[in-house]
Amino acid sequence: YKYAEVNDVIQKFNNIVIGEISNFTEKKSVTHFEYKKGNKKNFVEDQRNILSIAEKIRRNFKRVFIFSIGGSNLGPSLMNDIFNKNDLEIIFITGSDPDEYSSIQIQEDDALVISSKSFGTLETLSSYKEVCGNNFYHNSFAITANKSKALDFGIHEENIISFDSSTGGRFSIWSPINLVLCLLEGEKGYKDFLQGGKEMDDACLKIPEDNPAFQLSVQDIIYNNLLNVETTLVMNYDYKLRNFISFSQQVEMESNGKSIDSNNNKVDYQTGSIIWGGYGPESQHSFFQHVFQGTKQSNKYFICSRSDKLNY
């Protein structure tokens, strides 16, 4: 707990949550917390808009194609894994390789969602054009922080979902980028998710003795800097979380993948570790011999569901 006191960790996190400048390069605050708080007008309006459009899509379309990559894809795709009970077919297209989408035939009852913060992501926009051409703008929706570019592209204004430009891509699951959750769980599920996120934020502001997130974070720092263990293994034993590793890699490695501090000074310590892992039952039959009998050490997290559902 001395580490927290000396480095003022809890207060620094609180400063980020309340909206103080944390991106010193662009002189911006971090705003994804505002969607969880739900007490600022423009953020509440964004949420009303996403719920309204989600209802419109559920009522009028049979399939949903989401053109997205990176932070606009990883979180929503994880939500689809967790919450989709096969009532709505949702197909993600990253646009990274034509083989991903070359066989797709768009129908009139398909909803087409372009999800891009900048609305300038090459893979996202080019794959939409390849798949849809210029024939389906009436079925198309945009989720973006750059409304003018979406309008110029041809998306109808009433089909554009805006969100704040200071919401980082790796945290955009808390923003309207998370249309998927609204489609699958409706208003109550969406609000419950945000409330859960806020409760975790509040827990992270508690004193170190009552703060599990802080304690685990210090453990990671000790492994990485004192014990020279450079990788963190994340294993999931719940099928719905089988792709959680991809989401967690972005959240941690994009956030902490730095070699300079907030004042642009070169650091003399290790920052984030390398995150890897997978779905437990599959991984046990691929790389677990290395984990248990190999010469490399890793900081290990095992995530399980409360009920044992595994078929041994």
Residue map of PLM features:
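Extended, charge-enriched "interface" segments that sit outside catalytic cores
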Residues: 1-55
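A short acidic, often aromatic-flanked loop/helix-cap motif at beta-alpha or helix-coil junctions
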Residues: 3-7, 98-99, 166-172, 282-284, ...
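Acidic catalytic cores of enzymes that act on phosphate-bearing nucleotides/polynucleotides
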Residues: 5, 28-39, 87, 188-191, ...
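General structural feature for long, well-ordered alpha-helical segments within catalytic domains
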Residues: 9, 46-53, 75, 123, ...
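Residues that form generic nucleotide/phosphate-binding pockets
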Residues: 12, 16, 20, 196, ...
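Short coil/turn segments at secondary-structure boundaries
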Residues: 37-45, 66, 70, 74, ...
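Glycine-rich phosphate-binding loops that contact phosphosugars or nucleotide phosphates
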Residues: 51-209, 227
